[in-house]
């Protein structure tokens, strides 16, 4: 059946992917013929996600490496999977419930809500898997993993318990990013900085005990004070007046002469009456604001640091919903008598409280002034609500105890990070690491395996010689609040059965009847108190010690998504079980990832795998850059410049999208993506398709089985192209081995389009009518087969379709053997001759184009001095040169005729007479005018780029665009200058 005229990507992609899956082409170990393994872990996309350009880029690079190793016979596994994406998924499901009019999360309760989440996951969670398939991702989908799968959950909980028991996980109170909308701590990666128009309020804090000081108010030209005024207050500046209720200090720089003598004194906090100290800290910058900084350790990360260094208290004055928490807050009222105005703020939203504080400051005279201020405010990337730094009880990993092996692994080369600059980022983060907050106040996720029970010890019970508690004693305990005020104690265990034993062990030392208690799980501390009180009362009625219950409740929080995804390499391979996959594929070979998650994911995987199994998770980390729009701007919905990879696949085909991303994947450099580039690479696929159609029409594959070795060839053209094929195979392998994806793509582009389609196909046409026809058919078939094989990792669909419709194949291209030949195929004599022929044709074409010779006009050529090798090459290839350079014929002369253009080649030169063909004077004038205008434009660009202010202050994409235009202009200028020089040589 003859080939179609064009490649129908939309039809072929679905058909071919289905065929690959049915053949088991992507399964681990498929096509393995050698003992080496190659394993790569997909960075698990969110189960809520859909394919964006970052995914398309990242997964294209992974697929190239996977297909390349699979074709080379490696035992290959590309492990796919999705992340449960705690906060994102919970948000999506809650939104769906609201849309459908169903009860909200809190109304239906945790268990029922989680059932809804699982229902949603089964119905909608596979979207991105299908989208990755459209891209051509050759993952082993039979092993598709999910971070909430039962086996993965076992791994996550075991690691938590193990690290807890080693002392690497603890519960503590620290400042975290708090999202008031979701009422949970979130990671730095889930915070986006938003620039807002706001105000800077200056507030006066009265010095305590009637203290005063001289404050400079006028200065001379050298900045020395010349006038002072007596003040009994300090002025501080803030963008968040509502937080002043939690102030516990004023920081001044110890080198600031204005305030140094006040260090150790106190001010009285307005509205609250709290006396707070003036402390010395370098965080206060004398050149910024008033030089005195209000310190609120519980609501600002910088202030928290000052508080830790200077011993200031941290007072949280907000609830989880960012409303003011004052009246029932013992920390707020301790040591002071807040005014009625302050207490009236209780329960107000933080922004409403801000207005009231400012109004009160103005009314009471401690508002010093207001300045407009444009500043950055952190927002939750999903809630779009301003983040509140919040002091809360959370679970933390003591990263300082597990970080060093992760640093050493990269320093010693056990794991290599490419490019090297990203290794520096990795080291910087890890060497300045903070405790990692791993708890989230959500329901969807890995619930923390910690159970709490009421801490009721023997000291609470009087020993009256009787092992039982009578009714009077029970009610006395209840009246005394033994249960209502009992502190919780906790135990960590893999499951409730394990933790029950720990609580029973603790009860062994308690007085009867508690030492015969049965441990049961309850929902909350309040329920635990009720259950224990009832159990004690029931005991006194029936005196049956086995009837007693000792209630415990589980920590309601879940683990940070990064905690579970940090175990992705071992968890997906079956750990903690000693599975064959774990033994075979771990540690993995390479991780392909974006620079934005080096710390959040890469560094944590390194730390956790080394802490858990004492092994690095991967040998190489390849960090790719961002995909931007064609002007270098970051893609965003607000700018309207987002390119949807699925829409691009619909329009241009997956192969064109993949090849574009690959060809632009220069290590460490952002991609500037345009549809014009993608269209150009679609044309590249069309070029290969047309070359194969030409070959088919000339019977190239008829009766020829696919062969790995090149055919025997005697014709110079055939010997030359066989050598070029060997060269490009070596180039592609070297590039892929070094993760220079762009070099591999560009080498293939130059070979397939340039050497094969533009030159070899044209050179071979006359040979089909000679005695070299059979050899040429065999050579062309072999060369085009190698094009398909070498291109397949980057352009899998069109190459597989060509493979299936040409020749006699024993297996699909996806499992075809990768060639091992190389530069040994180069025939030096054929290489020299055909390189000379190509050089001559290109020089003639270039000269014609530069001086605007009409494209269809055939010109005579005069052969000047030419060595023996050149004469032989010309004699053997004269007909080709005449046809492809559009020449009338060759004559020979000792010197160039008048009005001729000289062409220099290796071993000699030629002349092209132009007299009467073009108006040389007019052409020179045109070129000179064009060059003059271009030079003027270039001078302007050089001036802008030479201005440090422009380079420093202009948007990055504007500077990059100017540099690109200058580079392109200089290249065009060089061409124009060369053309002028050619014409100037004409006598």
Swiss-Prot record:
GO terms for cellular component: cytosol. Residues 917-985 form a coiled coil. It catalyses: tRNA(Val) + L-valine + ATP = L-valyl-tRNA(Val) + AMP + diphosphate. A motif ('HIGH' region) lies at residues 45-55. NCBIfam families: PRK05729.1 (NF004349), valS (TIGR00422). It is found in: Cytoplasm. The gene is valS. InterPro entries: aa-tRNA-synth_I_CS, aa-tRNA-synth_Ia, Anticodon_Ia_Val, M/V/L/I-tRNA-synth_anticd-bd, Rossmann-like_a/b/a_fold, tRNA-bd_arm, tRNAsynth_Ia_anticodon-bd, Val-tRNA_synth_C_sf. Monomer. Belongs to the class-I aminoacyl-tRNA synthetase family. ValS type 1 subfamily. A motif ('KMSKS' region) lies at residues 634-638. Its EC number is 6.1.1.9. Keywords: Aminoacyl-tRNA synthetase, ATP-binding, Coiled coil, Cytoplasm, Ligase, Nucleotide-binding, Protein biosynthesis. GO terms for molecular function: aminoacyl-tRNA deacylase activity; ATP binding; valine-tRNA ligase activity. The keyword Protein biosynthesis applies. Catalyzes the attachment of valine to tRNA(Val). As ValRS can inadvertently accommodate and process structurally similar amino acids such as threonine, to avoid such errors, it has a 'posttransfer' editing activity that hydrolyzes mischarged Thr-tRNA(Val) in a tRNA-dependent manner. SUPFAM superfamilies: Anticodon-binding domain of a subclass of class I aminoacyl-tRNA synthetases, Nucleotidylyl transferase, tRNA-binding arm, ValRS/IleRS/LeuRS editing domain. GO terms for biological process: valyl-tRNA aminoacylation. ATP binds at residue 637. ValRS has two distinct active sites: one for aminoacylation and one for editing. The misactivated threonine is translocated from the active site to the editing site. The C-terminal coiled-coil domain is crucial for aminoacylation activity. It comes from Cereibacter sphaeroides (strain ATCC 17023 / DSM 158 / JCM 6121 / CCUG 31486 / LMG 2827 / NBRC 12203 / NCIMB 8253 / ATH 2.4.1.). This is Valine--tRNA ligase.
């Amino acid at each position: 059946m003859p080939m179609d005229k064009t490649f129908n990507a939309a039809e072929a992609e679905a058909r071919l992917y289905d065929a690959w899956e049915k053949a088991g082409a992507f399964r681990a170990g498929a096509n393995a013929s050698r003992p080496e393994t190659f394993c790569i872990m997909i960075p698990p996309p969110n189960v809520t996600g859909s394919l964006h350009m970052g995914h398309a880029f990242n997964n294209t690079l992974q697929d190239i490496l996977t297909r390349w190793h699979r074709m080379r016979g490696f035992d290959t596994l590309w492990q796919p999977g999705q992340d449960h994406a705690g906060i994102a998924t919970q948000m999506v499901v809650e939104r769906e419930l609201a849309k459908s009019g169903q009860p909200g999360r809190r109304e239906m309760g945790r268990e029922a809500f989680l059932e809804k989440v699982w229902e949603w996951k089964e119905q909608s969670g596979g979207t991105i898997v299908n989208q990755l398939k459209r891209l051509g991702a050759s993952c082993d989908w039979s092993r598709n993993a999910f971070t909430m799968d039962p086996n993965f959950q076992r791994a996550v909980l075991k690691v938590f318990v193990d690290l807890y028991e080693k002392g690497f996980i603890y519960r503590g109170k620290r400042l975290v990013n708090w999202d008031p909308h979701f009422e949970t701590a979130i990671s730095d990666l889930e915070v986006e900085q938003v620039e807002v128009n706001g105000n800077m309020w200056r507030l006066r804090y009265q010095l305590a005990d009637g203290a005063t000081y001289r404050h400079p108010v006028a200065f001379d030209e050298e900045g020395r004070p010349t006038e002072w005024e007596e003040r009994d207050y300090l002025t501080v500046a803030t963008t968040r007046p509502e937080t002043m209720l939690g102030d516990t200090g004023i920081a001044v720089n110890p080198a600031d002469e204005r305030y140094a003598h006040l260090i150790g004194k106190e001010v009285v906090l307005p509205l609250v009456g709290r006396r707070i100290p003036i402390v010395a800290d370098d965080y206060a910058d004398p050149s910024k604001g008033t030089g005195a900084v209000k310190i609120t350790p519980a609501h600002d990360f910088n202030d928290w640091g000052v508080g830790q260094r200077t011993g200031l208290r941290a007072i949280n004055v907000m609830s989880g919903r960012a409303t003011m928490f004052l009246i029932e807050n013992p920390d707020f009222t301790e040591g002071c008598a807040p005014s009625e105005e302050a207490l009236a703020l209780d329960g107000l939203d933080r922004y409403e409280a801000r207005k009231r504080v400012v109004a009160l400051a103005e009314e009471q005279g401690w508002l010093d002034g207001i300045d407009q201020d444009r500043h950055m405010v952190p927002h939750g990337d999903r809630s779009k609500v301003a983040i509140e730094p919040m002091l809360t009880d959370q679970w933390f990993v003591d990263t300082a105890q597990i970080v060093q092996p992760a640093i050493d692994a990269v320093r010693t080369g056990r794991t290599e990070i490419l490019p090297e600059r990203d290794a520096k980022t990795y080291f910087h983060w890890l060497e300045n690491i903070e405790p990692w907050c791993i708890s989230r106040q959500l329901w969807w996720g890995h619930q923390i395996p910690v159970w709490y029970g009421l801490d009721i010890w023997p000291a609470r019970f009087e020993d009256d010689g009787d092992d039982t508690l009578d009714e009077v004693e029970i009610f006395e305990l209840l009246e005394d609040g033994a249960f209502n005020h009992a502190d919780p104690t906790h135990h960590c265990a893999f499951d409730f059965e394990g933790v029950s034993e720990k609580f029973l062990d603790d009860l062994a030392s308690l007085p009867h009847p508690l030492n015969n208690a049965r441990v049961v799980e309850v929902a909350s501390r309040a329920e635990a108190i009720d259950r224990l009180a009832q159990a004690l009362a029931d005991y006194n009625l029936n005196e049956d010690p086995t009837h007693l219950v000792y209630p415990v409740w589980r920590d309601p929080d879940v683990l940070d998504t990064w905690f579970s995804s940090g175990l992705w390499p071992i968890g997906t391979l079956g750990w903690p079980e000693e599975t064959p996959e774990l033994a075979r594929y771990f540690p993995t070979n390479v991780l392909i990832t974006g620079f934005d998650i080096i710390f959040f994911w890469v560094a944590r995987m390194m730390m956790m795998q080394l802490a858990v199994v004492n092994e690095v998770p991967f040998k190489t980390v390849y960090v790719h850059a961002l995909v931007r729009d064609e002007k270098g701007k970051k893609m965003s919905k607000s700018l309207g410049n987002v390119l949807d990879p699925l829409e691009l696949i619909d329009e241009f085909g997956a192969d064109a999208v993949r090849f574009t991303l690959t060809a632009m994947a220069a290590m460490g450099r952002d991609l500037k993506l345009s549809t014009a580039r993608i269209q150009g690479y679609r044309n590249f696929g069309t070029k290969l398709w047309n070359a194969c159609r030409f070959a088919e029409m000339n019977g190239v594959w008829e009766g020829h089985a696919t062969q790995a070795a090149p055919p025997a060839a005697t014709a110079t053209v055939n010997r030359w192209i066989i050598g070029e094929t060997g060269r490009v195979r070596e180039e592609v392998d070297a590039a892929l081995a070094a993760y220079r994806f762009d070099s591999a793509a560009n080498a293939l582009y130059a070979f397939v389009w340039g050497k094969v389609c533009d030159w070899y196909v044209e050179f071979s046409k006359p040979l089909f009518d000679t005695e070299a026809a059979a050899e040429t058919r065999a050579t062309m078939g072999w060369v085009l087969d190698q094009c398909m094989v070498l291109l397949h990792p980057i352009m899998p669909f069109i190459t597989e379709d060509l493979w299936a419709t040409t020749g006699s194949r024993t297996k699909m291209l996806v499992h075809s053997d990768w060639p091992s030949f190389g530069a040994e195929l180069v025939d030096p004599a054929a290489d020299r001759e055909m390189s000379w022929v190509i050089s001559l044709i290109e020089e003639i074409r270039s000269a014609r184009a530069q001086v605007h010779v009409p494209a269809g006009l055939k010109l005579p050529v005069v052969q000047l001095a030419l060595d023996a090798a050149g004469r032989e090459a010309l004699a053997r290839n004269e007909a080709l040169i005449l046809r492809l350079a559009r020449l009338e014929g060759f004559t020979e002369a000792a010197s160039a005729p008048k009005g001729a253009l000289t062409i220099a080649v290796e071993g000699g030169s030629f002349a092209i007479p132009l007299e009467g063909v073009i108006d040389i004077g007019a052409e020179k004038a045109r070129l000179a005018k064009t060059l003059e205008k271009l030079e003027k434009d270039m001078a302007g660009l050089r001036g802008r780029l030479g201005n440090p202010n422009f380079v420093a202050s202009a948007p990055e994409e504007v500077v990059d665009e100017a540099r690109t235009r200058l580079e392109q202009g200089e290249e065009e200028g060089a061409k124009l200058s060369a053309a002028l020089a050619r014409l100037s040589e004409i006598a």
